[in-house]
Every structure is written in structure tokens, then in C-alpha cells.
Amino acid sequence: MSGSPAKWKRGLLIAACIILGVPLVLFLGLMATITIMYGPTYAYRVLVYNEATIQDYQRVFPSRAVSNQPPPFIFTRAEQPLTIGQLCFTYPAGNTQTIDFEPYLAQSDSTAFIVIKDDTVLYEKYLNGYSQDSVQRSFSMAKSITSTLVGLAVQDGYIHSLDDKMVGYLPELKGRGLDEMTIRDLLVMNSGIAFNLLPKDAFILSQPFYDEALMYYLPNTRSHILKLHAGREPVGAYFLYDDYYPLLEALIIERTSHKTISAYTEEKLWTQLGMEYPASWSLDSEQDGFEQAASGFNARAIDFAKFGRLFLKDGIWEGRQILPIGWGKEATSPDPNDKRPWMNDPNWKDAGGYYKYHWWGIVNEDGTYDYTATGSPGGQIIYISPSHNAIVVHNGASGDPMVWAMIARSIVHGLK
């Protein structure tokens, strides 16, 4: 070696500055770009929080309360809890998996698992510090709630027909290639709207520019969705799952009813179904106050089960018709005329699955069908099996909702 110790120290310091400085410059440049394009709140949220978690209703977003109303409806409890042992299920991709349920549940970051048949709770367990009164985040299960509010808005006369053109309610979208898109197109997620789908292998620094991140973290969702335009695919040519559809539905309900989505949920659902606890909708921001209708409903697992029960009873609750007559079946049953190719999640379709009104359905071997409200991350599900008169709810911090749907299916189909 040659050179004085002082020169070596100076050289090491320069090298360290370069090594540490380059990532910092890149990060600051990324933050500046995102801030210019979408504002400082979005830049902060997407870069600091990045991945969505089940704590986002507390750590990221403000919320608006959804009150319940006594008396609560209480499910009967089985005298002897259901024992769930080894399960074998086939994932929609085609691979079969065998698990020992209890160890699998314990190791899966689950927070709640409930099995109900004939209005009787056969199994109810809370894990990882959660209890029955712990708040669970819906993620995309919220879409099924939003679509239900659409049906109620039709019943109340706020929406004339599902076949109405979307632009009749949102005239800002006229002349953007979306004039023929109907409210029904939104409910079945027909292609038509440009949507930048996040690839599974997307470079982490590119993720803030994809629509999934934008729809989750933007503080001004209304103004963003009113700038949408047509995509490359014609309306109805494909099934294209994305978050714009329920947000557009929510905006239509908000405009026609002159009520917030939270107030309408409270009036039409949460005070009508004997919910044991209040709930809330997460908002994009305090200033804009628009509900996260695609991903942000917060409630207890047992009350999610009651929402499932409403559909199991075809919209009737304790003798009262809550949903429009026939809505439960219309929203969840397979459509034999739906021949669309799927742009995403094709394995579900290949396994006999379908998508309708923000429910994921699957046709059984005997011709009956089950359906699920799903949310990710965390494997959130409300699984409903009409032929078995059963409901399964799972909440968690990680996991694939389609895997949990197949686990629920295996359990339910094994019940006597």
C-alpha cells in the first residue's frame, strides 16, 4: 500500500458518500417526480407505507363511522365446536394441496376464522392478538358491499336501471370513448376503461405509477376517476379486474342519493342486519372525504358473516326484504351467456369460476354454485355456499384469498 492514512481516510469517505449518496439522489428524484405528478400526500404515502397492510385503517387513512343499531342478531353457538383436521383442496391453477388445518391456520398470519351452518357457529377462532371485537380490514371485499349499495340505489330510485349509461350520471366522462359503458358493465368489470395493471414482477420503484397504487393512496380519488378515458380494449370484450369500477359506482350513488357512502351503508345495511359492532369506511383524505369503495371497509369478522347471511337468505333478513327481490341470485349466480376471455386471473375461470357484481363464484360438480367476496392482502373472504346453507369468514395479514376460498369450500362441502 502507498499513500498517507489521511488520503486513505479521505478516499474511503468519498467512496462512502458515493455509495450512500446515489440511492439517496435516486430516492429524492423519485419523490420529486411523484410529487409533481400526483402531489405530496400521495408521494409520502406510497413511498413511506408502500405495501398495504391490515393496519392501514389506523396508520394511513382517516375514516367515517358507520353505526349499528340494537338489538344485535346473535348466531346460535354449537355445543361442540367443529373439529377441522386434514383438508385436501385444489387451487384454481390446478395443483392439489393437503394441509393439517389447525397448524396451517396458526402459521398463516390469520386473525379470524369462522364457520357457520344453519345459523349456527360451528367454529370461531381469533389469532395473533385479535379477538371478536377486533377491527378487520376488508380490502377488496369492500367491492361486494359497494355493488350491494348499487342494488339498493336501484330499489330506492336513485339509479333508474343497471343498463343506464354511466355518462348519464357522470357527464364529465362524455366524449372519452366511454359513452356506451353501462352501470352493469361496471358491476361485471367489462373492459373499456384504461387501467395500468401492476405486474407481479414490477420493479419496486415503478409501482407508484400503476393504477392500483394510485387508487389506494391518492387523497383526491374523485378528481382522478373523472379524468378516465377508454383503454385499448372495447367495452365488454374482456373481463378486466380493476379498482376503478366500484369507485365509479360509489360516485354515482353519492351524486344521486346526496348521501355519503358511509351514511348509505349505515342506513341500508348496518342498522338493518343486527350488527354487533359499528364499522367504518376509510376515506381518501379528510379534505376530499371520499370512501375507499374498492378496498376500505373496516368491521368485525362476525358482522362480515352477517353480511354474507343476507345473501344466503336472498336479501331477506328476519322476514324483512332488505335487498331488491331477486338481487341476491342475480348478483351471485353464473351467467351462461358470459363468454368473455379474462385479461387477469384466468385460472379462476378455467377452474369453473366466474365473476359477477363483484363476487367470485365457482360452479360445483352437481351444478350448484358457491361465491365469495375476496380481499387481498391477507386472504380476506366471505365464502357463501347456498346448497350447504353455510358461511365462512377468514381475515388475516397475509395469504391468497383464492386459497382460503378453496379451503372454505373443502370445509363446507365436508359438513353434514
Where is each model-derived feature located?
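N-terminal leader/targeting segments and the immediately adjacent pre-domain N-terminus
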Residues: S2-Y130, I159, V188, G192, ...
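Active-site SXXK
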Residues: D119, R137-L162, L186, E249-I253, ...
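Catalytic-site signature segments of enzymes, centered on catalytic residues
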Residues: Q132-D133, K200, Q207-Q287, Q292-S295
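Active-site-proximal alpha-helical segments within enzyme catalytic domains
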Residues: M189, Y245-I252, A293-W317, Q380-G396
